[in-house]
A protein has these predicted regions:
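Bacterial N-terminal signal peptides that target proteins for export
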Residues: 2-17
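Short N-terminal segments immediately surrounding and downstream of signal-peptide cleavage
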Residues: 30-45
Length: 155
């Protein structure tokens, strides 16, 4: 009888351990940041075109601007587009970064670790945040001195 009871509790324990491992899998399934070159940083200013809140990471898409507030164009006359990946939507919303707070037309400055493959996309660099400067480029550009800093990333 003792053997059957021990065996039963052993099976229950193994099932509980398996369930605990399965519950931890979503966190372990998180993607790698190896696609970003964390040895390089680019500070970019642009006009927000789209804010995409996502369960895993929110993305902000913007048209690159020069220091005078003019949207930069590529050789085909189209706006030079960039994107930045931030933290989870729930986390950044708790820090004031929401679709409502960052509507299209908002001028922002971000520092990113760019993709290694050269495409115009990056992840928000550690020790930086998103600088929001309204809808008109401030004199001297969109900087921490002329705008409001949101979502400062830890070092």
């Amino acid at each position: 009888m003792n053997t059957k009871l021990s065996r039963k509790w052993g099976i229950i324990g193994a099932c509980a351990a398996s369930l605990a491992m399965l519950a931890a899998m979503p966190a372990a399934a998180h993607h790698s940041f190896a696609m970003y070159d964390t040895t390089k940083s680019k500070t970019l200013t642009g006009m927000l075109t789209r804010f995409l809140p996502g369960a895993n990471h929110a993305q902000i898409l913007f048209s690159l601007m020069d220091e005078k507030g003019k949207v930069m164009l590529d050789d085909k006359g189209k706006p030079v587009m960039w994107g930045v990946e931030t933290g989870p939507a729930a986390l950044i919303a708790s820090k004031g970064v929401t679709v409502k707070a960052f509507p299209p037309g908002t001028i922002i400055t971000v520092t990113v670790h760019p993709l290694r493959d050269g495409r115009n996309f990056g992840t928000l660099a550690r020790g930086t945040g998103i600088v929001k400067c309204g809808t008109i480029m401030p004199q001297g550009g969109c900087t921490e001195k002329t705008g409001e800093v949101f979502l400062e990333m830890p070092q």
